[in-house]
Amino acid sequence: MSLLSATPVVAVIGGGPAGLMAAETLAAAGVPVDLFDAMPSVGRKFLLAGVGGMNITHAEEQSAFRQRYRERESGVSPWLDSFDSNALRAWIHELGIETFVGTSGRVFPADMKAAPLLRAWLHRLREQGVRIHTRSRWLGWDAEGRLRLAIPEGERLLQPQATVLALGGGSWPRLGSDGAWQALLAARGVELRPLEPANCGFEVAGWSDFLKTRYAGAPIKPAALALPGQPPRQGEFVLTDTGIEGSLVYALSAEIRTAIERDGQATLTLDLAPQRDLAELGRALARPRGSQSLANHLRRHAGIDGARAALLRELAPPETFQDMGRLAQACKAVPLTVVRARPLAEAISSAGGVPLEALDDGLMLRQLPGVFCAGEMLDWEAPTGGYLLTACFASGRAAGQGVLRWLAAGGSSA
């Protein structure tokens, strides 16, 4: 093992949005920065998020925006105070990338792609002097407190004045966020919360072979889902071989996960006709059926067919279909029970990680002076819709600013 010939003032570990933003914040202030990432290139999960349309942030009013972080709103809000969704859009425009607001309020780059944005950003970082080292996996610290890095040539040691860890959560490990950092921080006495899947699909006890064969992958829309005691949310979701996934499910994933942890399962109320009230639907289904099949009657008078009709038959008792009043009620409120989340590796994001209480206002670990954390490795979560990326960018900026204050005060790593 040997020391790198030029030890950086600041080492940033992790090349996702949080790490890159921390590096930019530091470099813009004139601080030499080296960024290390285990993968052959940086921003891999960011690029994956751009498949099908790069939803970068949301145009929602700021107080409502912040409420999306639920019980972590008070912890995330200070990051957003200095870099909110409006600031993020302005920053993107400075990179030469235009944005637009979709009908749902989601904000996208004009070309809907992540790659041009990442290329422009990396060009700026290199112009600012940020040195990016790929295929460089962080292995923790040695006995003298130096950073250990596995690189293609062997192992190298670093002793920067400050370190920013932006290593991601535990979802999509093949793209770099494998959660291996948990053991390294735990070994240094940092208390962590277990990583859990967030924005994830959920499994049912078992679909019928018919439903799996015919309708796995089929969208269920329009639809509304509600947990007990909560108002319904409208949107769409997808049937899978094992259960359900999709934007409507992701929006409820934190509450569903909590219910499963408490009760061993979560029973949602599914509304397959959210745009019609029960009385009107009951009158429509009560019309004489004549010689037409029940399937055609349901399609013509309730607008339910295909995958939605198959799901209704899967979930409702057989006798429901003998009484049009009961059928109308089932269309509006049929129980859908899920029993477990899909594996963390499949989730869009993760909950758990470094508790915000373990960090000071500059996102420095109280247990490890000079070591800062940012991004999804922190214990917060948010629904899809641009909220995840916004907080990753904002936390990276907050960590970078925290390092600047630390250095200005004469701090250095032990």
Feature-to-residue mapping (PLM):
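A conserved short coil-to-beta-strand element within the FAD-binding core of flavoproteins
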Residues: 134-146
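A conserved FAD-binding loop/helix module that cradles the flavin
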Residues: 171-184, 188, 379-411
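Glycine-rich FAD pyrophosphate-binding loop
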Residues: 27-51
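Short beta-strand to alpha-helix junction loop
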Residues: 76-84, 103-123, 172-177, 203-205, ...
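N-terminal Rossmann-like FAD-binding beta1-loop-alpha1 element of flavoenzymes
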Residues: 8-35, 403-404
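Residue-level recognition of phosphate/Mg2+-coordinating polar/acidic sites
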Residues: 28-29, 41, 62-64, 81, ...
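Glycine-rich loop(s) and the adjacent beta-strand/alpha-helix scaffold that form part
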Residues: 162-208
